[in-house]
Each structure stands twice: as C-alpha cells, then as structure tokens.
Amino acid sequence: GYFEGFAQNPYELTILHPEQLWGATALTDLDASKNKDVFVINRYASLVEHPIMYAQPDYTTFTVQGMEILIAVYSPNRKVTAASITPEMKQMMTAQKNFLGDFNATKKYAVLLYLSDNTKPDAEGFGALEHPTSTTVVMPEMLPIDELKEQLKDVVSHEFFHIVTPLTIHAKEIANFDYNNPKMSQHLWMYEGVTEYFANLFQINQGLITEAE
C-alpha cells in the first residue's frame, strides 16, 4: 500500500535476499551486490505493475527489434528450463513484433513462468496476468513439455498483446485507477475481446497456425 497523498511520489524499493536467489523482473537493479536489490520507480502505480520473481537463476534473454526479452522459469523439480522453452517464445514474440510494426511500448519485457508442484501444497490458481512490461504465468509443472509450450504460446501471446490494450489504449478509469474506491471500466469487451482476436490473427498472419486451426 501507500500513504495517502504519496501515490504519485517516486519509490525506492530495497530487497535483501539470499545470494543463491535472483530477482527476475523488467526493472533495473541499481545495486551490484549479490544479496541486495535496489529499484527506483516513478510512482506507486508503476511499482505494483512490476512483478519480481525470486528463484535460483534460470533465464534467457534475446532481443527482438530493439526490445529486450527476458524469459525466467521457476521449476521446483527442474523439469523445465528457460532454455527449453525459449525457441518457441522467441519465434512467437518475433512474429508478434513483426505484426505490430513500429509499435514499441517498452524497451524491456519479462516473461515470468512459475511452475507449480501438484504433489505438494503449492499455487493452484493457474493462469496469467499482464503488466506494461511483463507477464506472470502460473502453470502445473506436470504438463508434458510439448503441451506446456503450446499453452505458453497462446497464453503469452494474449498477454503480450495487452501492451496495446488496456495498457496503452484505455479508459480514464484504468489510467487513473482508484485503489481505495475502484470504478470498473465498461470496456472489458475491448480489452479482452480485441486482444484475443489479434492474438489469434497474428498467428495466422505470420504463418504460425492455419486459419482452420
């Protein structure tokens, strides 16, 4: 939360963590030490839109048309690695950038994948949530790798397109969100419907799937 009247103030977030853990995020760490991270954010709304996943380092990076992409994975039993899903993610996100053309809402984008261990008490709410510079995804670790890759292609492509709407094109209720007295937008049909339409259209347009599929 935030103190009343301070929502528009800059924030400095300091996180102390074990050396073996690394924070995957689209934010820039201003501290070079191995057990301390420092992030500076311009206002509270930006702070809550930048998730950070701490785990043993397992990530890849690549660049698509000037945008740095980070793929970070937490797999408790190490059944899946970032390297094992990166080729499909790179192909899909390259196709999306080709489809979007010059639209470039961020210079860095992070995909944070948390795989849940179904044999232990762990995350059960599977799905994904978009942010202006990242997507967080929670899926079961037990999924066969090919099925996981296929689901990730659909899920991440949908969430990535949210950088267009509602993260760039949106109503004033979204732009100036009141956390204490939220007013829901009437444009969910556009935010989700248009996004899902283009998440499928670009795959056809870029030859990733056929129109029949």
Where are these regions (language model features)?
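Generic, ordered loop/turn and secondary-structure boundary motif
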Residues: G1-E4, T28, P166, D178-N180, ...
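Non-catalytic architectural context of zinc metalloproteases
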Residues: G1-T106, E124-G127
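Alpha-helical structural motif
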Residues: N9, I85, M92, V156, ...
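Small-side-chain structural scaffolding
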Residues: A24-A26, A128, S157, G193, ...
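Alpha-helical scaffold segments in carbohydrate-active enzymes
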Residues: Y44, A95, E159, V194-L201
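Juxtacatalytic substrate-recognition/specificity segment
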Residues: T61-H187
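Acidic/His/Gly-enriched intrinsically disordered linker/tail segments
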Residues: I169-D178, P182-E213
